[in-house]
Amino acid sequence: METFLFTSESVNEGHPDKLCDQVSDAILDACLEQDPESKVACETCTKTNMVMVFGEITTKATVDYEKIVRDTCRGIGFTSADVGLDADNCKVLVNIEQQSPDIAQGVHGHLTKKPEEIGAGDQGHMFGYATDETPELMPLTHVWATKLGAKLTEVRKNKTCPWLRPDGKTQVTVEYKNDNGAMVPIRVHTVLISTQHDETVTNDQIAQDLKEHVIKPVIPSQYLDENTIFHLNPSGRFVIGGPHGDAGLTGRKIIIDTYGGWGAHGGGAFSGKDPTKVDRSGAYIVRQAAKSVVASGLARRCIVQVSYAIGVAEPLSVFVDTYKTGTIPDKDILTLIKENFDFRPGMMSINLDLLRGGNFRYQKTAAYGHFGRDDPDFSWETVKVLKPKA
């Protein structure tokens, strides 16, 4: 049997880049909660003892940026300089301006355009992907890498492993076979976890706890064998972490946010962007389209691309490929997609309820992936049943 290895990585919520994603989306939530028409392009960067938010925001909302930054960092677990950042005493810098009037008139006509007329906030192309290898219709390498990161955070916060600190990374390599275009996982080849820890714990204790409390609950035992390789804190020491260890920036974990290297990516990040930014809304609707194709039994694996021009409502192109796993021709699947999904930015916002912020709606997306999540706030995960015409 011919097989191949494929690897996906993830980082947990204490990684500096992910901290920035969460701050940017917490600010988006605050704006949309009070003013659903808010136009938000919010970036965040961080380094030792400092978090800065900057970008363009036009909103009627009253937003306490500094409080949001501190609350978000505290919620992650950055409560002292020892762990990488002190939420209550770090410097918070804010440099927010209004959206460019040139962009505003071209995209939404200074809020005068009807929803179906609202243009894309920028040019670009986005991809959605789905595969039948997991119940979430997501790649297994990505699902496990992501769940390992989430489990690391869980056992840190519930004090199962009190030596853990917020920063951490995971990576999973799976051996697959190609079944006529569909991906079939056979076994786990390698599990890699690098997690920040305190000064007291030994490397042996780290390895033992990670196997027992993180890997065992996430990866079913039938995928692990005597040849599975475990790299558990292979560098030997990871005490300094978070923004103290590395600078962080919004939008630097776009593969972790999506499909773990499977499918394709148009390059646009998600966090800190309101739904007129098709980098985000376009990627969400093509995930819904690809997932619906697979869930409807039309293919075992599917990728969908959409592209836009700034200020233009209708997409420039829509593309589908089922990797030769389709039960009907790809051109017929494309027709079904175009008939069942409205790719105009204003209509995507309505149909996917993307103008609703608050209650951590967008902040939740900013750690542990935007896709494959079982949460009603992730409206783009809702399947539309697609039926070919008889």
Curated annotation (Swiss-Prot):
Sections of the chain in a coiled coil: none
GO molecular function, one term: metal ion binding
EC number: 2.5.1.6
Residues annotated to bind K(+): E43
Cofactor entry: Mn(2+); Mg(2+); Co(2+); K(+)
Residues the record lists as binding Mg(2+): E9
Record NCBIfam families: metK
Annotated protein name in UniProt: S-adenosylmethionine synthase 1
Organism, as annotated: Nicotiana tabacum
Upper classification of the organism: Eukaryota, Viridiplantae, Streptophyta, Embryophyta, Tracheophyta
Gene field: SAMS1
